[in-house]
Amino acid sequence: MRLSSICSLIDGEKKEGQQLCLDAKFLRGKSAGEYQQRGKFVHKGDNIILVDGENSGEVFTVPCDGYMGSTFKQLWVSSIMHLPYVLNYILFYKELLRKSKRGAAIPHLNKEIFYSLIIGIPPYQEQMRIVNRINEIYSKIK
């Protein structure tokens, strides 16, 4: 099944009122963050994906409510999927997504490639087992 059948990149809810701007520098811990008066609101725990720039395809889990930086889209994943399974899948293809950007001046995530990636969809319990195994292996190589 193609990734497009279980997830999509959405803009987020337009809102007004002072909120923290969740840009890449803030999310990487390299800035204290700035506030802005309007933007595309996301909630703590949402996942957002970098769609513009050098690191297109990088996914972040939102640490607090705020406005997405302008280089992000919100990553919506179907409830039939175990979210960590999909996030690990996207992480597996991170280099492909970074190297297949579109645009000359400011490279953008190639959404055609993103949405056309083929993902196996095992039963939900198997998705959970796979993620647990990935986590076990990852903890041993850290």
Show where each model-derived region lies:
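A short beta-sheet element
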Residues: 38-91
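A short glycine-rich beta-alpha junction/loop motif
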Residues: 66-73, 103-124
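Conserved catalytic alpha/beta cores of large enzymes that bind or transform nucleotide phosphates
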Residues: 85-93, 103-105, 118
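Generic recognition of stable, solvent-exposed alpha-helical segments in well-folded globular domains
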Residues: 1, 37, 43-44, 81-88, ...
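Short amphipathic alpha-helical signal-transduction/dimerization elements
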Residues: 91-98, 138
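Non-catalytic DNA-recognition/assembly elements of restriction-modification systems
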Residues: 1-14, 21-28, 116, 120-142
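Short alpha-helix capping/helix-loop boundary micro-motifs
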Residues: 31-37
